[in-house]
Amino acid sequence: MNKIILITDQPPLDNASFCPFELGTIDECVEYISKQEVVGVDTETEGKDFTRNKIVMFQIGTADIQYVIDTRTISIEPLRAYLEGSAIKIFHNVKFDYKFIKSNYNIEVNNIYDTMLAECILHCGKDKWGYSLNHLTQRYLEISLNKEIRNKFIGLEGKPFTSEQICYGAQDIQYLLKIMDIQLKEIQQLGLSSLLLLETKTSLAFADIEYNGLCFDKESWLTNADINEGMVHKLEKELDEEITTNKLVEFMPNYLQLDMFTPVEELRKVNVKWSSPIQVKKVMNSYLQINLDKVNAFELYKYKDKPLVTRYLQYKEKQKISSTYGKSFLKYVMKDGKVR
């Protein structure tokens, strides 16, 4: 008979009528888990950013007994030796949990099996096949999980868990062992065991890369972004000059829109938006006296001896760098000042 054991320093928000569970201690959990060669592991977190958010629930157990630990009041430090040891720990999408466990507790989980990764290998990562835990429980066990509860851990703060949340946490690990057994039979039959081992090691390597992040020099980046923006503006002016020099009058307005702050000599005399492929195509067709369908680098390279084309290709290169790796790139810099 399945048993759910909650470990917390505060009582749950409601009774166990929705999901029967018992109360236990972290020592009892360690005693039971330390005897197991294979366990399922999962976490519930405040959010998706391991540099900002915390683990609020840690689940570990077997198909028969699942321990649901309220990590806001109970530390999983007593489980360190087991998690870093040789027993098999089954996760679903281990990269996510691995980074949170390492960030919150400086524990590096070893000897991992990832049910999501195994499923991707079995089905070549085909789109629309479905690789969520709910997809797997339905596919292999004909059991549906209510994943809507997952969002109820966000903004939980110090509130006690509901029995619904406790049950949800337990179910996330209850079926992992059965799924692994089914997957491994097929993996072995197909001769994919070595591939699974390689992919698992690679997944953890990438998890460490994401965890460590890339150091980022914000000041130098912004200086370089300003330089690139300046080069883009310079090339835009040179492109405008090519329009006036070649007297492409259809792209030169009959009048200038004056304002109080811009000198007349600085007003644009060309009404082409150089970042617009549609407008640039009209310019190139008029300038080259041909009918281009596209104005990408491949199509224009054959006309690179033409000054306007040369300037435009230079502009596109710098404009791409400026838009992709300019000031907007700062949105990828995380709280700790690193890029992930």
What function would you assign to each model-found segment?
Residues 23-37, 80-83:
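A short acidic-Thr-Gly-centered motif at the start of a beta-strand
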Residues 24-27, 43-44, 74-78, 190:
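Short alpha-helical segments and helix-capping/turn motifs at coil-helix boundaries
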Residues 38-51:
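Short acidic, Gly/Ser-rich segments with clustered Asp/Glu that frequently serve as metal-coordination loops
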